Amino acid sequence: MQEKATLKRYGIFLVGVLICAMGIAFLSRSALGTSPLSSVSFVLYLATDVSAGLYTFACNMLFLAVDVILTRRFGWMQWLQIPATFVFSLCIDLWLAVIPTQLNGPLSLKVLYLILGCPIMALGITLEVLANVTILPGEGIVKTLAAKGGWEFGNVKVAFDCTLTAIASIIAFLTFGRLNGVGIGTLVSALAVGQLVKLYSRCIKRSAARRAGGGAVQ
């Protein structure tokens, strides 16, 4: 019974990763700017012939390495982040191949992609957290920095996202002479995704409470 529950949690996590990657792909293909966490990887992808997934994997492995240095431990949670990141990176490349870019598309479709991307990405993150199996290195490093510095997770997350966006913007300016891959969509996703995750989490908790109450009555 316990093994079945564990497998279910892993399944939920994998579905969450797949959905989160889809949301990121919609944001990236909107041509309005990708998510802050994916900004460096996506700008490098636009500037070279290397896939976004490969850059995503490399960036996340860097985050994991810093996490290990700061915590001085490499347990099963860290080990799990490696295959999880691999699947996540693969899913990003998959969705980018399937979802057409709106670089030269009408503004209405760009906005539609942005509107789709934020809630889809938030749903994926919510499922990843709900599964409680492991976390991706991009979130893990923020958690570690917050714990080490005694700061609030939310504040560190904002600072981390701003830092990545700034780095991506510098790379874009040096490579293209303008912002490319970073834009209003990056700002919107930074503001919206966290709030949507909170909303989804509350809905899931209420649903679970209702089911538990119904079970108790029966």
Label the model's feature ranges.
Residues 1-218:
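Core subunits and conserved enzymes of cellular information-processing
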